């Protein structure tokens, strides 16, 4: 760039959600998750370059209700060798009547997916993922830091406990 011209640091950064071309003969791996997984897609892809074809869903996976709606499209028709997946951070989010993030104590804030429904949704999603015959790996939900808008510190522990019950029932390892 010319002197005094700002350089856009994201200008040359590849889109982690863009489709990739498979290298023949390498295992196919699919990442399913939210913005946390979007953040680790490119570094993981670089780390595993030449070892696997690392794909990810073309969007933020959001809550389990979004997963149930889109899972068939995300899986597509090709064979997967490994599926690394997570839902939770958007399930435990408190939403207002207009879809805005709210702290739990604010008027009108309700958890997007109550924990019992989350567990049932995960069970349905795992049943669908198992039909792919891929090796499945669950990723726990990241902790909620203090001051997170729309989320309550400690909720991820409860949601991870619900997820653990599902993964144990299905024999799926947790990463």
Q: What positions do the PLM features span?
A:
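Short intrinsically disordered, low-complexity coil segments enriched in acidic
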Residues: 1-6, 171-175
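Serine-esterase "nucleophile elbow" of acetyl-processing enzymes
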Residues: 4-79, 83
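Alpha-helical cap/lid subdomain in secreted, periplasmic
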Residues: 47-53, 65-175
């Amino acid at each position: 760039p010319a002197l005094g011209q700002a350089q856009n640091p994201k200008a040359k950064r590849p889109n982690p959600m863009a489709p990739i071309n498979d290298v023949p003969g390498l295992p196919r791996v699919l990442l399913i998750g939210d913005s946390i997984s979007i953040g680790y897609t490119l570094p993981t892809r670089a780390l595993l370059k030449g070892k696997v074809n690392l794909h990810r869903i073309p969007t933020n996976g959001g809550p389990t209700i979004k997963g149930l709606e889109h899972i068939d499209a995300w899986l597509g028709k090709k064979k997967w060798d490994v599926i690394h997946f997570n839902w939770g951070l958007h399930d435990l989010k408190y939403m207002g009547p207009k879809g805005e993030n709210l702290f739990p104590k604010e008027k009108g804030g309700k958890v997007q997916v109550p924990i019992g429904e989350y567990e049932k949704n995960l069970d349905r999603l795992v049943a669908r993922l198992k039909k792919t015959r891929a090796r499945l790996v669950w990723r726990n939900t990241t902790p909620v830091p203090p001051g997170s808008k729309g989320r309550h510190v400690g909720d991820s522990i409860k949601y991870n406990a619900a997820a653990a019950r599902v993964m144990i029932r299905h024999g799926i390892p947790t990463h």
